[in-house]
Amino acid sequence: MGILDKLYEENDSEIVEEFINQWDYIIDDIDLVIERLETDYKNSVDELFRIFHSLKSATAFLKLKRINVFAQLVEDVLENARQKDKATDELIDWLFLASGQIMKWYDEINHNKELSSIDARLLKLPKGY
């Protein structure tokens, strides 16, 4: 049984479909928001924080612990980023890695696979965040 089958088995189908639709929005926008960090830092950090906060809440409800813990980690980094005036290259690179991880899990859910492990490079947090 893949992860999508498990989600439908354990939750109302409307909730699962809403979760996938919400994730579609994240996938469509996240890289553009990361790119905007260089030109509109404060608004972009706030938007990224909202994205990962929403993902954290949804995955907690659906009991997707791996994604939930990861979303909390990114949210913590972004909370620290809110205290800064600009993004470092290291932060931007790390956020693109985080985006890639989210996209990989999105693909695995949509193809009803098991969730892969987190990319180990993401465990090295950007300095100062």
Language-model regions: role of each:
Residues 1-129:
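Non-catalytic helical tethers at domain boundaries
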